[in-house]
A protein has these predicted regions:
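Active-site-adjacent beta->alpha loops and helix N-cap segments on the catalytic face
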Residues: 36-46, 66-71, 85-101, 111-118, ...
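Glycine-rich phosphate-binding active-site loops on the catalytic face of alpha/beta enzymes
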Residues: 24, 29-32, 125-136, 175-195
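Catalytic cores of alpha/beta
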Residues: 11-19, 69-74, 95, 112-123, ...
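C-terminal alpha-helical cap/extension of soluble enzyme domains
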Residues: 149-210
């Protein structure tokens, strides 16, 4: 089982860094913008250092701009614990091959089973399908995810774009074991009203004996 925190918000990182639940961080330019961070290599350098300082195993940073190859090289140069996120486009496939380190890449923005097969052919470490966006489209999401599971053996299917804990639990039931979880789901993920009620009863019983 592998969970990655899908957030560029430092408070989210700090919140779960000691839980033992999240092994790594994943980000993209949209998440940086929402966190009011500049999309730049200087920001990436800072995020890389902060992630390692909180004992995350790695951080995934996405290419941007007009020269993906140059940005990807700079991400790799941050250190051995950086992984390059590359959109699953024709240009992205060329980039994975040109970089020559598929084990340090993730194909992201995946919306079809064939992209999983491409990821497997390229030997990338992760392929990230966008579950909620597929659910909201007219595509057959269950067939797509079945195809991803069937085609990816070395490559890990890193399920992204979750809107709710219910979606997360549904995918767990289908056998998925590798997820990016957005910071917006942390409250629902880390607590359950019935558990909280049980704790109150336990504490009340203990207090009555004091």
């Amino acid at each position: 089982m592998e969970w990655l925190l899908d957030s560029a918000t430092l408070e989210d990182w700090k919140r779960v860094s000691g839980t033992g639940l999240f092994s790594a961080i994943t980000t993209n330019p949209l998440l940086l913008a929402r966190a009011e961070l500049q999309v730049s290599m200087q920001t990436y350098k800072t995020l890389y250092q902060q992630a390692l300082g909180m004992d995350y195993e790695h951080i995934q940073l996405q290419v941007f701009g007009d020269d993906w190859f140059h940005v990807a090289q700079q991400i790799l140069d941050l250190g051995e614990y950086s992984i390059v996120k590359i959109p699953a486009t024709e240009a992205g496939f060329h980039l994975v091959t040109r970089l020559g380190v598929p084990e340090r890449t993730t194909l992201t923005g995946v919306y079809s089973a064939r992209m999983g097969a491409m990821a497997e052919c390229l030997g990338v470490k992760y392929v990230a399908p966008y579950y909620a966006r597929l659910v909201e489209s007219e595509r057959d999401v269950e067939a797509i995810f079945a195809g991803l599971r069937a085609s990816c053996k070395r490559t890990r299917v890193l399920v992204a774009s979750l809107r709710s804990v219910d979606q997360f639990e549904h995918l767990l039931g289908l056998g998925h074991r590798c997820f990016t979880i957005p910071g917006t789901l942390l409250n629902d993920l880390l607590s359950d009203p019935m558990t909280e009620a049980a704790v109150e009863q336990f504490e009340a019983a203990a207090a009555a004996q004091i």
